Amino acid sequence: MKIAIAGASGRMGRMLIEAVLNDADAQLVGALDRAGSPFLGQDAGAFVGKDTGIKLTDDLDAVFAQADYLIDFTRPEGTIAHIEAALRHDVKLVIGTTGFTAEQKAQLQAAAAKLGIVFAANMSVGVNVTLKLLEFAAQHFSHGYDIEIIEAHHRHKVDAPSGTALMMGEAVAGALGRSLDDCAVYGRHGVTGERDPSSIGFAAVRGGDIVGDHTVLFAGIGERIEITHKSSSRVSYAQGALRAVRFLSARGAGLFDMQDVLGLR
């Protein structure tokens, strides 16, 4: 599997480089970084104490010409540029970027008519199994329980609520036969009035080096149920991304997520 990594100098990029180098079936063939990055020209393996001969570059076409797959955990504007390059070079994509606008999501979906793409806000096995648990719980706590989603991430995260929190909200709303767009409440401030019993609330915490904590609270009268997932490192995301690459190796064009990859549908 000839794999290139986008955002190679970032926290997730470094973890992905290490995961690819440690996988006997994978070959690192490219490492992309943003224009102007101080790491351009550095060996991609330097982050993990290995010499790979692969230099960090901002030359999209040079990298895509060598790769069969790109793993992308960057930012929406960067991912859109990567999608355009992937279309030019017929490269399959594993995308963990969050914070897309509706227009950007439409571009991604259009590209999937020609490319195999796995797009998931969270690629850990644990989170995706948790989504199934939430669907089950929502069906049984559909009356008399208020639903709130609380997430916490490191101080550098730029979007809120997290993509994973939104995935959880969509799983719960879907199980209840609702549209998340119609029932989501993002943060509360001032005099908000009494809680709408059909709403799904979101709260976001940012601080320190928290990798990612997510709790879905079902609050009833006399009891409350909390379903929580906590990430202690990004290793689970990297392993999930490689699992997604393997999944795409046997697929043609189409838009998939980790529920497809893990056979949870």
Curated annotation (Swiss-Prot):
Domain of life of the source: Bacteria
Compartment annotation: Cytoplasm
Assigned protein family: Belongs to the DapB family.
Protein's recorded name: 4-hydroxy-tetrahydrodipicolinate reductase
GO cellular component terms given for this protein: cytosol
Membrane-spanning intervals of the chain: none
Residues that bind NADP(+): R34
GO biological process: diaminopimelate biosynthetic process; lysine biosynthetic process via diaminopimelate
Biological role stated in the UniProt entry: Catalyzes the conversion of 4-hydroxy-tetrahydrodipicolinate (HTPA) to tetrahydrodipicolinate.
Keywords: Amino-acid biosynthesis, Cytoplasm, Diaminopimelate biosynthesis, Lysine biosynthesis, NAD, NADP, Oxidoreductase
GO MF annotation list: 4-hydroxy-tetrahydrodipicolinate reductase; NAD binding; NADP binding; oxidoreductase activity, acting on CH or CH2 groups, NAD or NADP as acceptor
